[in-house]
Each structure stands twice: as C-alpha cells, then as structure tokens.
C-alpha cells in the first residue's frame, strides 16, 4: 500500500467520460495526508430537478453516485500553487511564506483546501501554534458538510480555532450564529486585521470573492497580492 502523497492545501482532479465528453472536477481529500492504502473524498450529490437553479443536477456527482462498489476512476494531480508545509509555513508559487494567523473565508457545499490546512495544523499541535479564524458560509446549516466534525472533533482540541457560521436560511431550531451574507462587517468582527504575520485563505464563488471578500480584506489592511490566497 502507498500514500497518496498529496501536499496539504492542494487538490486532485477526478476525470471521467460522461455522455461522450470529458468531465473534470476538483476535490480535496478529507483523509490525513499520511493515510496508507486509500484516501477519502466527501462529495455532495446534486440530483436532477433538486435545485431550480441547476435543473440537470451535478454532472460529476451524479456519475460518481451511479458507480458500483469496486469501480475505478481516473484522478490527476496535485493541482494548485499553494501548499502548507506545517508550523506556520506555506509555499506559494515556489516561494516560502510565513503566517502566525490564518483568516479563512469559506463558502460553498464542498470540502476545500482550507479544511485540509485546518486539519494539518490540529494534527501538529501543540507544536503548531498557528491561530485560525474561520468564517464558514452556506445556504443552510445542513449544507455545511464538515460542521459536525468541526464542532465535535476540531473545536474541543484547541483554543486557536475560532469559527463563525453564516447561513442564508435560518434553521428551525435555535441558531446562535450569523444569518445573511458574508460582508465587511462580518469579516471585521470575526477575522483578524491584516499585518505581516497574517494570511487570508479564501474559497468560494468567484463573484463573492471579487465583489465582497477581496475589497473587504483590502480595507482591513491585507496586501491582496501577498496575503490573500484564493483556492
């Protein structure tokens, strides 16, 4: 058995021929980087006619859901130019970077390189004392695939991880976090201000990143060229 060998902060492409056309989607493994013999992907299935915005559903996710146990798939990687090498150190486009604090903004239903980085920091504690501040946004709390793991496994292990959830739709039961959209006010309240020892890790819809997140971070003192890494 072998290790996948995927550096922390990078992802793989799953490739398949669907309807006679090549389809590729990027996924971040949820299993530890040193896992031997297998790796895990957490994928939400977007079924046809489930969401009026996407009447055909997810092409790749439905294809994967249709595969029988024991089927094979093609993957390629690693992909992305950002890697977390541990204990506050990043490699970005081949250059070493250092961060005492991470300001993480994550929106969407999938798992991301942000999750991978968080797990790597937690695995190295107490040697890795990186502070992590996460704003995690989604339509509903049920769409936050890793929320249960964050609440039950990650948060109890460290005081260096601070999390603020934001949902578009208020849950039926009690909800003690944010409702609405991620904006500059939310970012200022739950993320550290920019300085030479803070890096922002951003993953989400392009429109949100360009229209809200990047302008907000710039007003908070972040150097967008050096301290804002978009996955």
Swiss-Prot record:
Cofactor binding description: Binds 1 FAD.
Residues given in the record as FAD binding sites: 25-28, 42-47, 59-61, 112
NAD found in the keyword field: yes
Domain FAD-binding FR-type: 1-85
Catalytic activity from the UniProt record: nitrite + NAD(+) + H2O = nitrate + NADH + H(+); nitrite + NADP(+) + H2O = nitrate + NADPH + H(+)
Top-level taxon of origin: Eukaryota
InterPro entries: CBR-like, Cbr1-like_FAD-bd_dom, FAD-bd_FR_type, Flavoprot_Pyr_Nucl_cyt_Rdtase, FNR_nucleotide-bd, OxRdtase_FAD/NAD-bd, Riboflavin_synthase-like_b-brl
Gene Ontology MF annotations: FAD binding; metal ion binding; nitrate reductase (NADH) activity; nitrate reductase (NADPH) activity
Enzyme type, top EC level: oxidoreductase
Keyword Transferase in record: no
UniProt EC number: 1.7.1.2
Cofactor: FAD; heme; Mo-molybdopterin
Signal peptide location: none
Keyword annotations from UniProtKB, A to Z: FAD, Flavoprotein, Heme, Iron, Metal-binding, Molybdenum, NAD, NADP, Nitrate assimilation, Oxidoreductase
One BP annotation, GO: nitrate assimilation
Alphabetized Pfam families for the sequence: FAD_binding_6 (PF00970), NAD_binding_1 (PF00175)
Disulfides per UniProt: none
Assembly and oligomerization: Homodimer.
Family membership: Belongs to the nitrate reductase family.
Function: Nitrate reductase is a key enzyme involved in the first step of nitrate assimilation in plants, fungi and bacteria.
UniProt protein name: Nitrate reductase [NAD(P)H]
């Amino acid at each position: 058995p072998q290790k996948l060998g995927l550096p922390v902060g990078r992802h793989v492409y799953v490739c398949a021929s669907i309807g006679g056309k090549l389809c590729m989607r990027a996924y971040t493994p949820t299993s530890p980087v040193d896992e031997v013999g297998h790796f895990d992907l957490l994928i939400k299935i977007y079924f046809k006619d489930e969401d009026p915005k996407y009447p055909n559903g997810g092409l790749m996710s439905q294809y994967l859901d249709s595969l029988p146990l024991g089927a094979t798939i093609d993957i390629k990687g690693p992909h992305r130019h950002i890697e977390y090498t541990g204990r506050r150190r990043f490699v970005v486009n081949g250059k070493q970077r250092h961060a005492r604090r991470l300001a993480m903004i994550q929106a969407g239903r999938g798992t991301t390189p942000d999750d991978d980085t968080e797990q790597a920091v937690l695995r190295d504690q107490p040697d890795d004392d990186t502070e992590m501040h996460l704003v995690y946004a989604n339509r509903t709390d049920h769409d936050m695939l890793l929320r249960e793991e964050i609440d039950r496994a990650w948060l109890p292990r460290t005081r260096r991880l601070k999390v603020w959830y934001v949902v578009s739709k208020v849950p039926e039961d009690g909800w003690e976090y944010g409702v609405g959209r991620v904006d500059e006010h939310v970012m200022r309240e739950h993320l550290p201000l920019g300085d030479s020892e803070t890096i922002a890790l951003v993953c989400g819809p392009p429109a949100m990143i360009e229209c809200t997140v990047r302008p907000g971070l710039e007003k908070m003192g972040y150097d967008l060229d050096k301290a804002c890494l978009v996955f």
